[in-house]
């Protein structure tokens, strides 16, 4: 069993914002594999299915971003899985170029409050994550306002491709492991972690 968690904020006002790309990625995965993410369980919307022959649970915590760890901790416990080996967390990253994908096996939160909440709840940085870049081309004066702003029409094609790439990264991880996924998607060197991301609530 693998747990695939997308991070975001619940509520229509946040649905199509950069900070909710984790939720949107889970929605894309669910669409591709015919999984219905509609059960309320462990403070999250969840759905069970099979991807590449692997039993999976897709989850979107409904706790608001900064409390994501509470939901993830409950899910890991209920599913009786090892969060360091059997979980993939998908989230937005303000330090990566817009629309890019990076697969990472461990590391700090890099300023992302949802990831920090998970690290705190599980007491480890050792879990697989797929990061979706949301860094704009212009210099930001207010990161919080930006990550919670509505996606612009001009950004949608890039976002659409990024969501497909995130779904493909999950498939590669489940079929071949994280190494091949990193080789495929981590094509450019990562910028240093700036801790510049500001999460909502």
Swiss-Prot record:
| Family statement drawn from the similarity comment of this UniProt entry | Belongs to the PTH family.
Subcellular location per UniProt equals: Cytoplasm
Q: Which cysteines are joined by disulfide bonds?
A: none
Protein name in UniProt? Peptidyl-tRNA hydrolase
> What would you give as a GO molecular function for this chain, any one?
tRNA binding
Give the protein's function.
Hydrolyzes ribosome-free peptidyl-tRNAs (with 1 or more amino acids incorporated), which drop off the ribosome during protein synthesis, or as a result of ribosome stalling.
Q: Which organism is it from?
A: Koribacter versatilis (strain Ellin345)
Q: Does the keyword Cytoplasm apply?
A: yes
